[in-house]
């Protein structure tokens, strides 16, 4: 043990780091010293609430998956239950083949079960190919190896055609991962589909992508019917915070009561001299200070986490440091008028549409608490893995691109009263083929090193609930090691 109070250093003041700090405080008590270090000058990481003249808006993640009851329960345990709000229920749309169309309901993250509802969004030939894919007399069954992982875009294109990738799968996944489907692995991004393909193979059924998608949809429908039959209230698809995610990260800081070291990074982690096997680490900060820590939780981006593990866990260092990152930008615009803005929650943009934006969220339509303020709030999203050209544009250029695309899609051409441009450099990890296996190898290596854990959006999922779960697991690991 280090001299003085039990000390845990948390590298990263984003959601993962703050939740880990909160869990550590609950487990270790008020006497523990918890030090949260972050090179940024603010807490929250990729969650960022900014103030406008009409109230707070989000320029990072906007919402979380409402069916993740564990996340909602956690927020309520923090005393934030009254802050949670639900969307309006207005439909979302997709722009493809030159038109804005209703979002199809018979797909699994864009992978269709049939051509129903896809006419116009896709060509007649592609619709016919979708309907033939599950018929062994027209299309050879899919060769699937149980437990295997494949490139999502390549799989969908090989079975259903390029249009399905560009008009459905890439737009739906682009907002989550800032990647085209061609840059993602199936098992990490659409796990239910991969598991269903495994199940079909295990019992010797003819395997097809559309049949697997239909089975996933059927399972979801059955689960929903069971919930309704039990009297349970159906969970909204999304939830967010009335006053922004700032409510969450400020509350976590207040209740975890860590020492905040903002504007300073962690440069190196090494086993403390004379502390072999004890788990005690020397944590060198970017300003030259060295903190003696009984445990360390790494809640930083993958390249940073990988570099910091170099001396204490080389195997995990190499794996985690190899996770690629995608950059993106959000252009949040507040308008004094809503006249002419369509009555839906937003538009996803097909990958081959020829526009700069990949999506628009009509936040004031989607969220009643924002609509109550009057005027309109619209968020444009830009940037994909492997292409930072749009993210590198100036604020004025990005704003002009957002306004031009918004006008092209909707005809809405009001002058924004306020604009906030937020760039997320390397903000979203890429979930490539084999990502899950690599993370299991990294976890196994880290499990052999006492009093250190790593978590974050690069690990088990980029969404808010996934980061919550990951942070809790990381905190529990070091607490168990300290016991």
Feature annotation, model-predicted:
Residues 25-51:
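Glycine-rich FAD pyrophosphate-binding loop
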Residues 73-105, 160-165, 255-262, 267-280:
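Feature captures the FAD/FMN-dependent oxidoreductase FAD-binding
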Residues 265-378, 383-392, 396, 408-409, ...:
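Mid-domain catalytic core of redox enzymes
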Residues 16, 42, 303:
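Conserved Rossmann-like nucleotide-cofactor binding loop
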Residues 53-144:
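Dinucleotide-binding Rossmann-like beta1-alpha1 core, especially the glycine-rich loop
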Residues 104-112, 360-483:
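Conserved flavin/dinucleotide-binding core of flavoenzymes
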Residues 134-268:
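Active-site/ligand-binding neighborhood in enzyme catalytic cores
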Residues 2-16:
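Beta1/beta-strand and adjacent pyrophosphate-binding region of the FAD-binding site
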């Amino acid at each position: 043990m280090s001299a003085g109070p039990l000390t845990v250093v948390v590298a990263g003041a984003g959601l993962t780091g703050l939740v880990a700090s909160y869990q550590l405080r609950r487990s270790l008590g008020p006497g523990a010293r918890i030090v949260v270090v972050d090179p940024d000058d603010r807490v929250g990481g990729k969650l960022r609430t900014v103030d406008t003249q009409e109230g707070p808006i989000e320029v990072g993640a906007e919402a979380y998956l409402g069916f993740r009851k564990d996340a909602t329960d956690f927020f309520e345990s923090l005393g934030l239950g009254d802050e949670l709000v639900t969307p309006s229920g207005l439909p979302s749309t997709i722009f493809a083949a030159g038109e804005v169309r209703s979002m199809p309901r018979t797909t699994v993250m864009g992978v269709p079960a049939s051509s129903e509802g896809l006419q116009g969004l896709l060509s007649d030939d592609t619709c016919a190919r979708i309907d033939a894919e599950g018929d062994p007399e027209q299309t050879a069954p899919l060769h699937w190896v149980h437990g295997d992982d494949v490139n999502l875009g390549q799989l969908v294109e090989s079975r259903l055609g390029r249009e399905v990738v560009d008009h459905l799968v890439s737009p739906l996944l682009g907002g989550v991962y800032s990647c085209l489907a061609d840059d993602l692995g199936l098992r990490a991004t659409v796990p239910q589909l991969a598991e269903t393909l495994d199940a079909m193979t295990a019992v010797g059924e003819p395997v097809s992508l559309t049949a697997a998608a239909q089975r996933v949809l059927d399972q979801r429908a059955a689960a929903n019917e069971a919930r309704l039959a039990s009297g349970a209230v159906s969970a909204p698809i999304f939830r967010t915070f009335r006053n922004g995610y700032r409510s969450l990260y400020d509350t976590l800081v207040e209740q975890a009561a860590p020492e905040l070291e903002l504007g300073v990074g962690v440069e190196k982690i090494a086993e403390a001299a004379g502390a072999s096997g004890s788990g005690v680490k020397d944590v060198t900060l970017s300003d030259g200070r060295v903190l003696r820590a009984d445990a360390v939780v790494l809640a930083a981006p993958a390249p940073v986490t990988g570099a910091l593990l170099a001396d204490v866990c080389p195997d995990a260092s190499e794996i985690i440091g190899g996770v690629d990152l995608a950059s993106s930008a959000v252009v949040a615009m507040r308008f004094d008028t809503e006249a002419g803005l369509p009555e839906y929650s937003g538009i996803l943009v097909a990958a081959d549409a020829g526009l700069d934006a990949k999506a628009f969220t009509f936040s004031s339509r989607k969220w009643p608490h924002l609509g109550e303020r009057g005027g309109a709030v619209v968020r444009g999203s830009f940037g994909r893995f492997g292409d930072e050209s749009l993210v590198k544009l100036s604020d004025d250029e990005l704003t002009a691109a957002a306004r031009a695309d918004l006008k092209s899609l909707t005809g809405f051409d009001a002058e924004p009263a306020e604009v906030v441009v937020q760039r997320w450099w390397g903000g979203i990890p890429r979930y490539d083929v084999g990502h899950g296996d690599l993370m299991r190898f990294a976890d196994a290596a880290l499990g052999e090193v006492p009093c250190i854990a790593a978590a974050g959006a690069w690990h088990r999922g980029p969404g808010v609930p996934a980061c919550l779960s990951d942070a809790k697991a990381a905190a529990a690991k070091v607490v168990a090691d300290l016991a």
